[in-house]
């Protein structure tokens, strides 16, 4: 997801992030989480394992595990491209899809066996400007996929290109300002929910019929550009789980959940604030849920932050930074848990990065990465 430009508020990293004690969380093995008080940037609890580094100027925006093999489908914000990334670096990035008339690909999800849906449109990583009305939802079907010859991806990415991938537009979003995060609401009826960061609302998209509608328009989702150097970026990441839609707001630095109808996506209750401006030194972008009901945030300043028991009824407020320092990866954009047997043993959380968003407006933009954090060290898995 796109990070809110907070240059007007925070230009430097602080040296220490203060965190409350971790609540006890039951993992798959009924282990309990240790207590953590103060997190030092120079001594992070979790160390990054860099799996892949892209060329300079490559903003990796979002990723989702591929159920077929445990690798990852990843999107680029800096180019209209979608790649298959090896979770073990067993093969170079495999170009799955290109959209020549567009500039960027944002959220991506898997719906159906080896079928993915992505938000595609025009967004500038240099100016942070979106082109309203340029977006659509595209289907990327990998069921016929095979590795092809070595062909160029874009100017700086010469990579293997997939054969047999079928790409189809399934819906236009002519009234969207900046469709960003994406989640599956109802796999049976083909309903996706899309966060519109510019308009501060959620769209529903039926990928079978192409029908779109505003599902939720709640004040908690609204952007507030005055809080972040002029860039209006409200609701950002979102995820549906067990009757609730979870989402963060980049401008207001908040995290919410709201009860929704699992057929229409419309709200059936008020928004509930789960974290209100508790991200002062870390600023979350996208997030993911774990098997124990916790939320894991990928944060712009290089942190992995954790909020325990959110979807289990055992929620206790308090954000804890469990990874991040001044020399580790920055510009974390998305986080997803791995699905292979080895990933489950390690509690492997895979994170995409842009390397630092403010560099993309200059002559020497940063380089995105795929990074793995093994959370089993914390006792959560």
Region annotations inferred by a language model:
Residues 1-32:
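Fungal secretory targeting signals
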Residues 45-48, 125, 130-188, 201:
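Asp-box/WD-like beta-propeller blade repeats and closely related beta-sheet repeat scaffolds
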Residues 53-69, 99-125, 163-191, 199, ...:
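Beta-rich, blade/repeat-based domains predominating
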Residues 336-381:
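Blade-level signature of beta-propeller repeat domains, shared across WD40, Kelch, NHL, RCC1
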Residues 77, 120-123, 142, 187, ...:
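Short loop/turn segments immediately following the C-termini of beta-strands
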Residues 77-78, 125-135, 197-198, 250-253, ...:
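Short, solvent-exposed loop/turn segments at conserved positions within beta-propeller repeat blades
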Residues 32-58, 163-167:
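A short helix->beta-strand "capping" segment at the edge of beta-propeller domains
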Residues 86-91, 141-146, 161-163, 206-210, ...:
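Short loop/turn segments that connect beta-strands within beta-propeller blades
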